[in-house]
C-alpha cells in the first residue's frame, strides 16, 4: 500500500477500489475485433494484435490523465475568478486540489475488456467450458502483461508515478507475478524506472459501452439469444 493510497471505497459499479479523492478512469477493448475467421472451424484469436492494442490503450489512458489535470486546472482558475467570497469558495478549491494531487501522485487507470461472451462464441467455444476458461485466462494474461509493460515504458519516457517505491512493491504478489513474466531487459527497466501508473486494469460491467459495440457486456455470456 502506497502512502496516501489506502483503499476506502469503490466507484459506483464496484470494479475499481479507490483511495480518497481518486478518479475512476475506464477504457475497454472490444475482444470481438481480434477474432479471425469468426464462426468457422479454423477461427483463432489474434493475441499479437490484441497485445499491441492494449499497449496503445494504456498509453492513451495515461494521456487522458494529463487532460484530466489540465481540466482541473481550468476549473480551479474559474473558481478563483468567481465573485463569491474566498471563505465560500475554499471548500470547493480544497476538493479540487485533493483530486488533482491524487491524479498526479497515482495516475490510476482502469483498462479492461468487453465482448468476451461473443468472442468465445465466434471461436466456437462454449461459455464456461474448460477450453473457454483457458482462453479467458490467456486473454487476461496478455492484457496484464502488455498493460504493465507499457506502463514501464511510459515510466522510462515520462517518469514513474510519484508514489512509486520499488522497495515497497518488489515482493508484492500481484506485481511481482507480472514482472516475473517479462523479458530480462524489461525487469531491469522496471527496477530502474518503475511504473507510470499505480494500477492499470479492471473488469467493468460495460453495460453502456457494449450497447455501442453491440456485443455481450464485459465478461458476461449471452443471457438470451432472442426476446419476445
Protein language model regions, located:
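Internal maturation/activation junctions in enzymes
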Residues: 53-100, 104, 126-206
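Glycine-rich phosphate/pyrophosphate-binding beta-alpha loops
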Residues: 204, 215-220
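Function-dense linear segments that define catalytic or interfacial modules
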Residues: 1-103, 108, 113-119, 123, ...
Amino acid at each position: 500500500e502506497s502512502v496516501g493510497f489506502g483503499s476506502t471505497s469503490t466507484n459506483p459499479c464496484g470494479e475499481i477500489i479507490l483511495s480518497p479523492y481518486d478518479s475512476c478512469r475506464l477504457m475497454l477493448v472490444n475482444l470481438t475485433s481480434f477474432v479471425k475467421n469468426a464462426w468457422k472451424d479454423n477461427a483463432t484469436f489474434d493475441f499479437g494484435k490484441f497485445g499491441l492494442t492494449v499497449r496503445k490503450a494504456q498509453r492513451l489512458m495515461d494521456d487522458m490523465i494529463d487532460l484530466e489535470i489540465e481540466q482541473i486546472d481550468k476549473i480551479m482558475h474559474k473558481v478563483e475568478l468567481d465573485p463569491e467570497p474566498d471563505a465560500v469558495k475554499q471548500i470547493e478549491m480544497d476538493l479540487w486540489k485533493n483530486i488533482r494531487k491524487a491524479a498526479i501522485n497515482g495516475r490510476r487507470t482502469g483498462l479492461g475488456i468487453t465482448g468476451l461472451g461473443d468472442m468465445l462464441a465466434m471461436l466456437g467455444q462454449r461459455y464456461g467450458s474448460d477450453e473457454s476458461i483457458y482462453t479467458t485466462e490467456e486473454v487476461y494474461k496478455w492484457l496484464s502483461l502488455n498493460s504493465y509493460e507499457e506502463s514501464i515504458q511510459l515510466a522510462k519516457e515520462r517518469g514513474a508515478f510519484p508514489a512509486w517505491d520499488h522497495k515497497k512493491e518488489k515482493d508484492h504478489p500481484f506485481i511481482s507475478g507480472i514482472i516475473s513474466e517479462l523479458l530480462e531487459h524489461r525487469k531491469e527497466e522496471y527496477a530502474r524506472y518503475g511504473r507510470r501508473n499505480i494500477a492499470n486494469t479492471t473488469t467493468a460491467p460495460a453495460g453502456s459501452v457494449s450497447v455501442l459495440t453491440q456485443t455481450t457486456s464485459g465478461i458476461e455470456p449471452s443471457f438470451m439469444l432472442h426476446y419476445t
